[in-house]
Swiss-Prot record:
PTM note: Tyr-161 forms a radical intermediate that is referred to as redox-active TyrZ, YZ or Y-Z.
EC numbers: 1.10.3.9
Binding site for a quinone: 215, 264-265
Gene field: psbA
Residue ranges of the TM segments: 29-46, 118-133, 142-156, 197-218, 274-288
SUPFAM superfamilies the UniProt entry points to: Bacterial photosystem II reaction centre, L and M subunits
Annotated compartments: Plastid, Chloroplast thylakoid membrane
Catalytic activity, reaction form: 2 a plastoquinone + 4 hnu + 2 H2O = 2 a plastoquinol + O2
Molecular functions per Gene Ontology: chlorophyll binding; electron transporter, transferring electrons within the cyclic electron transport pathway of photosynthesis activity; iron ion binding; oxidoreductase activity, acting on diphenols and related substances as donors, oxygen as acceptor
The name this protein goes by in its record: Photosystem II protein D1
GO cellular component: chloroplast thylakoid membrane; photosystem II
Summary of subunit composition and partner proteins: PSII is composed of 1 copy each of membrane proteins PsbA, PsbB, PsbC, PsbD, PsbE, PsbF, PsbH, PsbI, PsbJ, PsbK, PsbL, PsbM, PsbT, PsbY, PsbZ, Psb30/Ycf12, at least 3 peripheral proteins of the oxygen-evolving complex and a large number of cofactors. It forms dimeric complexes.
Organism: Bigelowiella natans
Residues given in the record as pheophytin a binding sites: 126
Residues bound to chlorophyll a PD1: 198
Amino acid sequence: MTAIIERRENSSLWARFCEWITSTENRLYIGWFGVLMVPTLLTATTVFIIGFIAAPPVDIDGIREPVSGSLLYGNNIISGAIVPTSNAIGLHFYPIWEAASVDEWLYNGGPYQMIVCHFFIGVCSYMGREWELSFRLGMRPWIAVAYSAPVAAATAVFIIYPIGQGSFSDGMPLGISGTFNFMIVFQAEHNILMHPFHMLGVAGVFGGSLFSAMHGSLVTSSLIRQTTENESTNNGYVFGQEEETYNIVAAHGYFGRLIFQYASFNNSRSLHFFLAAWPVIGIWFTAMGISTMAFNLNGFNFNQSIIDSQGRVINSWADIINRANLGMEVMHERNAHNFPLDLA
């Protein structure tokens, strides 16, 4: 048998570029989604940093009452934010070239829309990049599926909610105090605390924290010691070792006796799927709740639903929450309303 070896022809520049982009040997995987992710996230990050430091006040309500958000205009890390695009712009696409000047663009909050749009494309591309790398390594796609939960949450507050309310000025400000303001106003207008999807999200986040702490503490408490008493147990682990690093039987037995037998997983794969699925599904529900409340399908209203035999109202906690909602509602954007309550 004769083997014929031919010298490989020099590949084109484009072919070498494609090979480099999709190579899993790079220190950081780029991928085709990364080609879109890198410039969009760099743009969003750069504009955010510059805007947080130096952006002038923004006329968020469209009534010529600008709100300051940057450090150079009197804010600190906690009170500072990228102020949302003006209500005068609404949902219009507002790039720099649509404004008469850069000053007008800044006054109307153009940077917020620029950051949010690039950030949205960037995080979606990051999710796609996770799937792409998993595919090339022969892994299952669940990492990208799990990441879809925070992507859905960000999409809900930055994209879906402004669309439903008719203006980017209703989007979540990009700052700490601005986020709190968004939460308070959202409760006032939509009664989110009484929405079952938000309740499921709370169960997902708090439950996920509890399960993570339980799992971590159980594993840490049942490590198989490979070191002396005078050395850290952690030093007994060798990266890539084939044998188990902890005794799952001991952990299962402990937890089964602490609660009851069937509360403890005896399958490591089922356990880790549960740890991933619980918070992800909870955050999915919260994102769906925000997206439905965006179109004013609000939380439950049990106001004045309990009355005595004489027809007098017996207040429940729902009525107390409603009273708080009314107070928050009439106090926010107090110069923008012609009526005590939004007609929506």
